[in-house]
Amino acid sequence: KGSVSVDLGASYHLSMGILDEMASWTIGFQAANLGSKLDGQKLPARLGLGGAIDLPFSMDNRLQVALDFNYLLPSEYRHLQAGIGAEYNFLKYGIIRGGYHFGDNDKGTGNYGTLGCGINFWPIRADFSYALADKDCFMHKTWQLGIGIVF
């Protein structure tokens, strides 16, 4: 038996001049996992709303701050999640970032912080991140390493 699921989203982006540089902000909405059951199980649909602001201090240094909210459905998964994070890109090459996820321990999503760093050496990008979570959180002792090509 087949199944179909769709995700829908939209975003709005606006640039503006601040401190002789072009700052920008973005706001977006997403509805995900909308569709029929998969192997007899309903997918946990998600409604999301988020925004970010990008503040350049110079051509080589910028700060990005983001905030998002997600509401999960159906009833057995129903709860609100939120996240906030910041990333500072310095000298065009180095990146440091941090964030915090607000979840629901009873639903298995938990609260945890994240720290990360990265390097951009065009066309290569490398990132490392680590989750700061309690022992009973699913993100406990989680780290990620990513290497990519920018084009």
Each predicted region: which residue ranges?
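Loop-centered beta-sheet repeat module
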Residues: 1-39, 43
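Outer membrane beta-barrel transmembrane domains
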Residues: 26-28, 39-151
